[in-house]
Regions:
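Long C-terminal interaction/binding lobes of large macromolecular proteins
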Residues: 3, 7-9, 102, 115-172
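Arginine residue identity/basic-tract feature
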Residues: 5, 9, 17, 21, ...
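Short, positively charged, Gly/Tyr-enriched micro-motifs
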Residues: 53-138, 143
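Short, conserved DNA-binding cores of transcription-related domains
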Residues: 1-64
Length: 172
């Protein structure tokens, strides 16, 4: 990530500002959907280390921690499901996913929609309208950052990070 300047970051664990430096990179695979087909990309993820000893992976918003699928891949699957563009079987075939994977994403989306909006507002807002609102924001990063700060996990992340972990948003 070209824009990341480790010397300006604040460690989300100890709070030290300017104590991080580039530590390493690791490879990661990510499934996306391009030109009508699922595509697997290989990415290089930067890791920082703080003087307190904690290391941190710098993930762009389109990567969901602990998921091999990209955020926009999952949102596209869900959008096509909510729009009822095809049968569930065809949808799963088109995106090369299992029915159980689709159900997991649907359950997770509904749960996190309710967490974000609150139970009553969630019942009033359709899943499709919530999804559209996410995608129509001027900066998805604002929502993603607010979600992490509020719930200590990324949107559509299936579980909280292993303890002891202090996922927060890096920033100057």
């Amino acid at each position: 990530m070209k824009g990341v300047r480790p010397e300006l970051q604040t460690c989300p664990c100890c709070g030290a500002r300017g104590a991080c430096r580039i530590h390493a990179c690791y490879g990661r695979s990510l499934v996306d959907f391009i030109s009508g087909a699922p595509v697997c990309h290989s990415l290089c993820i930067m890791r920082l280390i703080c003087t307190c000893g904690h290391t941190h992976a710098i993930l762009p918003d389109f990567i969901i921690p602990y998921s091999g699928y990209g955020l926009f891949f999952i949102l596209r699957v869900l959008a096509e499901y909510f729009l009822r563009l095809s049968t569930v079987e065809r949808l799963c075939e088109r995106f090369s996913i299992t029915l159980s994977q689709l159900r997991c994403w649907l359950d997770l989306f509904q749960t996190q929609k309710e967490e974000w909006l609150g139970a009553l507002s969630s019942m009033e807002a359709s899943s499709l309208s919530f999804l559209k609102a996410l995608l129509m924001q001027a900066a998805y990063s604002d929502f993603a950052s607010a979600f992490v700060r509020r719930f200590t996990k990324s949107f559509l992340q299936s579980h909280k990070n292993p303890a002891p972990y202090c996922q927060q948003v890096f920033g100057p």
